Amino acid sequence: LDKFSINVPGDPSSAAFFTALTLLKKNSYLKIKKVGLNPTRIGFYSLLKKSGAKITFSNKKKVNNELVGDVIVKSSSLRPINASKKYYLNTTDEYPILFVISALIKGNSFFSGISDLKNKESDRIKEMQKILKQIGVLSKFKNGKLLIKGKKIEKNITKKINVPNLGDHRICMSAAILGLLTGSEVRIKNFETVGTSSPNFLKIVKQLGGSFEKKNL
């Protein structure tokens, strides 16, 4: 995967996956146009900025009484993430990709008050733990708090990541981004579920230089 610059229009939850890719890939840049900047929608970005992410908002204006603007993301050297339970409601959908980011930051990241993630389209805590373990990243969940023992991966690790048929679009996309960042081969069953929220996901991946093929697994 080469360094890249790209503009992605639209939804902040869908763009979160490419935000992760941008932050962790050297010399990369992302611009997301016309994003809703209501404080209840941008917990993901606020949390990452606390960890050193180079994320800024520009061209802000009110549209139908809602704040809208462009989100600009640049490659960053991130510190481990410490997400208290107050972030849960504003960041619910983005936790799987936050777990991926944490896995690739050297040090311990903590996520508190996230027990409800066990009751989404899949048990997102358990399933992401399984995925991260396949690249050698350990984690522990206890009393509503997840610890991820991240490690910085400098070179392609050429691992194989297998994701079963969970029917969970956010797990699928998170695993795909993990594969792009680590050089791993990822096999994801029922990837079609991604179309429910991000029908252009694979198209954008291809534009960035990623490769994929569809098989009957």
Give names to the regions the model predicted.
Residues 1-217:
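Short, structured segments at the rim of ligand-binding sites
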